[in-house]
């Protein structure tokens, strides 16, 4: 799995200037004012969620499509794609619904989801 999501993937519904063009983001779709698609807003966590829901593939094999497999194809599997001694320790913590809770790069936490308790 891959994503070519543009900057709009992280934006709320509204109008934005992206790449020198006006882009309208609505319901997780980015379009130009004339209605043409402006680009992808599919994030990798959503792609993984869709992939498992629509194929019935098991979690371990699904995770490999966004970790080990691309690292091997890009010839960076000596340091990326899995957690092992001597590797970079880049990983994401997520729940059963693929909601991201934390992201680590080279073993350092760079993102943590803030949970608001009601």
Could you describe each region identified by the protein language model?
Residues 1-3, 8-87, 91-93:
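His/Asp/Glu-enriched, well-ordered alpha-helical/loop segment
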Residues 72, 83-118:
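C-terminal cap of metal-dependent C-N hydrolases
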